């Protein structure tokens, strides 16, 4: 392999994976509260194992929510409607251990404060990442992994592949070329799919259908060659799945939720948290910033870090890194960010309109790369004349290969 070539791998999991199931339930709880009370403060964790769901956390809200009905509806939508599939929404036990948010946190963060002065709900570091290797400004390794799971979901729902069950995992390895800090996909090196299935399909037929109806439909033909490796249900039979096979917990798929191992991650999960929790809202804002810079042609790759202290509105630090793909230096890129984005939590919530019931879909197939989400709408940037002139200079032309 050439010194400028490298392999990178990302994974995804389906909506029926136990951890993702918990993420969706936590976000369904959040949405139910925000739909009735946009100012609700929600921190809801979900745990699942065979025949059991438990909600735990802190919620302060005027909403009235029937958790029994809500949880069962999410499980039904996912497709767990019989114990033979690993779970049954009709017979499972739903336990609720939800309490009020700490009044000390409320007083320090949001009570009697103007929106611009709302403090961060906790300390922490958050990252946003974007790359020009796909139209969605997402890493192709993760994008294809998500799409493989979604195609399985579609074929199961339509009945075309009746043997497919809700729990699955995918993984894609891509051979890249490094070009001046930018990443250019060359070919798909390896595809891994492990999907739960009914007991009446042979492994041979399962693998054949995965290749013909999933992989060949999802992955562009020009990226697959005779050397592409396939591991399809490599462990063999996968009948026992869902919570019967593994316990599930909210917030355990944070790399699947974000960039598939690219960029960086601050460690905070998203699901079940209202937007005053900067683990969520600031990570969305950092993605918004990174994507806006890439889509504006200011860099080909971008990593943004932001940090906060609990109860403090202004970020402690903001960092922009372009991996050498910009004609501008990091200080100049940061000036553009500061001129165009207000990263105080209250202003993030206002500008992205985050006090809405929009979160359950984010827990299904990744929080980024879907144009329906407001943080995926690249902002048109105001750039002063000198920086605009420099951004069209030789360094960027050389990196991108085209003149702007």
From Swiss-Prot:
Organism annotation: Caenorhabditis elegans
Other remarks on this protein: Protein expression is regulated by post-transcriptional regulation: under rich-diet conditions, mett-10 binds and methylates sams-5 mRNA, directly inhibiting splicing and protein production of S-adenosylmethionine synthase.
Residues that, per the record, bind K(+): 45
Cofactor: Mg(2+); K(+)
Associated pathway: Amino-acid biosynthesis; S-adenosyl-L-methionine biosynthesis; S-adenosyl-L-methionine from L-methionine: step 1/1
Gene: sams-5
Binding site for Mg(2+): 11
Cellular component annotations (GO), alphabetically ordered: cytosol
Assigned EC number: 2.5.1.6
Role description: Catalyzes the formation of S-adenosylmethionine from methionine and ATP. The reaction comprises two steps that are both catalyzed by the same enzyme: formation of S-adenosylmethionine (AdoMet) and triphosphate, and subsequent hydrolysis of the triphosphate.
Gene3D superfamilies: 3.30.300.10
Keyword set includes Mitochondrion: no
Lineage of the organism: Eukaryota, Metazoa, Ecdysozoa, Nematoda, Chromadorea
Pfam families on file: S-AdoMet_synt_C (PF02773), S-AdoMet_synt_M (PF02772), S-AdoMet_synt_N (PF00438)
Protein name: Probable S-adenosylmethionine synthase 5
GO biological processes: one-carbon metabolic process; S-adenosylmethionine biosynthetic process
Annotated PROSITE patterns: ADOMET_SYNTHASE_1 (PS00376), ADOMET_SYNTHASE_2 (PS00377)
Family affiliation: Belongs to the AdoMet synthase family.
Top-level class of the enzyme under EC nomenclature: transferase
Binding of L-methionine, residues: 58, 101, 246, 277
Keywords associated with the record: ATP-binding, Magnesium, Metal-binding, Nucleotide-binding, One-carbon metabolism, Potassium, Transferase
